[in-house]
Amino acid sequence: MNHQKYIRNFSIIAHIDHGKSTLADRLIEHCGGLQAREMSQQVLDSMDIEKERGITIKAQTVRLVYKAKDGNTYYLNLMDTPGHVDFAYEVSRSLAACEGSLLVVDSTQGVEAQTLTNVYQAIENDHEIVLVLNKLDLPASEPEQVKQQIEDIIGIDTSEAVLISAKSGIGIDLVLEAIVNKLPPPKESSSDILKALLVDSWYDPYLGVVILVRVIDGYLRKNMRIKMMATNSVYNVENVGYFTPKKHISDVLHAGAIGFFTAAIKQVADCKVGDTITDEKKPCEQALPGFKPNLPVVFCGLYPTDSSEFEHLKDSLAKLRLNDASFEYEMESSSALGVGFRCGFLGLLHLEIIQERLSREFDLDLITTAPSVVYKIHMRDGENLEIHNPADLPDLQKIESMEEPWIKATIMVPDEFLGAVLSLCTEKRGMQLDHSYIANRAKIIYKLPLNEIVYDFYDRLKSCSKGYASFEWQMDVYEPSELVKLGILVNAEVVDALSTIVHRSRAEQRGRALCVRLKDLIPRQQIDIAIQASIGSRIIARETIKALRKDVLSKCYGGDISRKRKLLEKQKAGKKRMRQYGNIEIPQSAFIAALKIGDE
């Protein structure tokens, strides 16, 4: 087993829906990783939400045993990676643990924006790349055209591309032969001292934290005392093994292998991804380079609809955090919504998935406030702040300048939808950086404010291109911007949960839209309700919900006018008292609808 020349570590990279997980299923089936009765679609996507949405969120690993045509038995370690931009960090971790990649491209759709990002990441990691063209059995498949597109855009040789249909299993043996013959084995171990890369970790209710590692030098065996170099914490290894994708316990993991171990670690936070693991008695001299830390870019408030559920929400977030170290949260309170948490996410899909997991796995009913990003505030007294909650924004008089984050977005779109996509980017304050054509598809690169993206950009991009546009982005720079805090007042009371930070040019439009929406959502009361949008002390939009009026004269048939006047005066005095002391109850349904992402 310690013949490293018979090991191949590879990851599968592709855009969403191009067939990564299906190809992984076929490879597992072909190599007998699971018996036929144990196979299911997307066998590596363990969460229900992954299967339903057809996306991969957590990278998974499998060891396959393959008897090649040259008569040798090879051990193939497959890392299935996510395709969505929010989980690019998961991709970078998987790539760092491998020497080669299978680049899967849908032969009916060609190169998409995320394909490019993942390929460039693989090239940065010095990966050997095997090109696989999938969905060959579909009538719309155009392999030759897609090959030309790949050569033009990415610049890799397509003459030895493997043509397959992962769904029907055509060409799977060719993929396995290409892995064995074209991808390099791990580098020879230069030392007997343990040096391993911590690729991922997750929480298992029975075993504690399970750690996925790639052994670079030496070996990892049961009962060894190991040290994490970033935290200097020492643990005793309890179990060592690998996935096929079922868990298999083994005695030892040799150099070049990818596997897991458990060591009675209580929290995932104690295991920093990208850390170097070494032997406590004979530590290695130098740590591995590791990864860039993953910082949240989108923030929003999560509140339980019923305040008695707060403790349940707190426990649920702590459990999710055990498996997802990139997700952050802290407690906050709102006068309108009560006590909840301010949470940080990698992007909107990440936000949606955490929300959905909370409602499904923990049966929670939540209100989500409008998403926001991190702003840099420069105060007149020289202090610099970073805020992501509109409620924390200081008084505008004390602020010297504000900076907002901008992103660099790559959009691939068929040319017939180009006009609609360009006008959407312009509407979102975008600046065009580049524009090129590949066959009948346009590739545009835009600089866009992240603040505009987190609302409804992705949905609107998909609808204006009938679902054909693909979009990928990375953080670019912070730039000064004319930002203001848009406040919403109901009967002169500020509703903090509806406050947002917007660009001054969009404030009036967004304020008016929110007022109109709230007017439809808040039920009529016995008095007039004023809904106002404000910037500081200036009101920029107003809507009024007219009062319900009880007919107090309904029982007066004729009779003296003074009797009627007395009843009307009594009603008037009652309404005046209500205006003075009455609190307007905004129903939860109104909050939820008003906070729906995007402007209708």
Curated annotation (Swiss-Prot):
GO terms for cellular component: plasma membrane
Catalytic reaction(s) noted: GTP + H2O = GDP + phosphate + H(+)
GO molecular function per UniProt: GTP binding; GTPase activity; guanosine tetraphosphate binding; ribosome binding; translation elongation factor activity
The organism's place on the tree of life at top rank: Bacteria
Protein's membrane topology: Peripheral membrane protein
Keywords tagged on the record: Cell inner membrane, Cell membrane, GTP-binding, Hydrolase, Membrane, Nucleotide-binding, Protein biosynthesis
KW Cell membrane (keyword) present: yes
Gene3D superfamilies: 3.30.70.240, Elongation factor 4, C-terminal domain (3.30.70.2570), Elongation Factor G (Translational Gtpase), domain 3 (3.30.70.870), P-loop containing nucleotide triphosphate hydrolases (3.40.50.300), Translation factors (2.40.30.10)
Gene Ontology BP terms: positive regulation of translation
Pfam families given in the database record: EFG_C (PF00679), GTP_EFTU (PF00009), GTP_EFTU_D2 (PF03144), LepA_C (PF06421)
Residue span(s) of domain tr-type G: 5-187
Entry EC no(s): 3.6.5.n1
HAMAP family with a match to the protein in the record: LepA (MF_00071)
Family per similarity comment: Belongs to the TRAFAC class translation factor GTPase superfamily. Classic translation factor GTPase family. LepA subfamily.
Protein name per UniProt: Elongation factor 4
Organism: Rickettsia peacockii (strain Rustic)
Gene symbol of the encoding locus: lepA
